[in-house]
């Protein structure tokens, strides 16, 4: 399981011309699920999403987490994140979890984050074609693994 996180001033996800999830200041996390990801990895990634320090403190250092700032979290499933891009000119998707497995893991991640984060957790729609709109703050972008 992996997450591409971006610190944002705002972000939203639109499906069929309707906004299905949106946040103000916080984190947008694109989530890729890989075959064999287990519950422990999902719990660990949730913990990292909420506690990873990417927000500035009073001294300007990245020393505050999403939990510290009470910012929004927008979780978006993205199977292409788990693609194999090691050779050729076209991605391979055998390194991404099958849809049923990925949806279960993604939903578990959402549930854990909603349980632990009072700042609000929004999502896109699993398996849908989504338009993601964001304003990256920094830019600040990190690739996280459990």
UniProtKB/Swiss-Prot annotation:
A motif (Gly-cisPro motif, important for rejection of L-amino acids) lies at residues 138-139. One of its GO terms (molecular function) is D-tyrosyl-tRNA(Tyr) deacylase activity. It is found in: Cytoplasm. Keywords: Cytoplasm, Hydrolase, RNA-binding, tRNA-binding. Its EC number is 3.1.1.96. InterPro entries: Daa-tRNA_deacyls_DTD, DTD-like_sf. GO terms for biological process: D-amino acid catabolic process. It comes from the Bacteria. One of its GO terms (cellular component) is cytoplasm. Its main location: cytoplasm. It catalyses: glycyl-tRNA(Ala) + H2O = tRNA(Ala) + glycine + H(+); a D-aminoacyl-tRNA + H2O = a tRNA + a D-alpha-amino acid + H(+). Pfam families: Tyr_Deacylase. NCBIfam families: D-aminoacyl-tRNA deacylase. Homodimer. A Gly-cisPro motif from one monomer fits into the active site of the other monomer to allow specific chiral rejection of L-amino acids. HAMAP family: Deacylase_Dtd (MF_00518). An aminoacyl-tRNA editing enzyme that deacylates mischarged D-aminoacyl-tRNAs. Also deacylates mischarged glycyl-tRNA(Ala), protecting cells against glycine mischarging by AlaRS. Acts via tRNA-based rather than protein-based catalysis; rejects L-amino acids rather than detecting D-amino acids in the active site. By recycling D-aminoacyl-tRNA to D-amino acids and free tRNA molecules, this enzyme counteracts the toxicity associated with the formation of D-aminoacyl-tRNA entities in vivo and helps enforce protein L-homochirality. Belongs to the DTD family. This is D-aminoacyl-tRNA deacylase. It comes from Xanthomonas oryzae pv. oryzae (strain KACC10331 / KXO85).
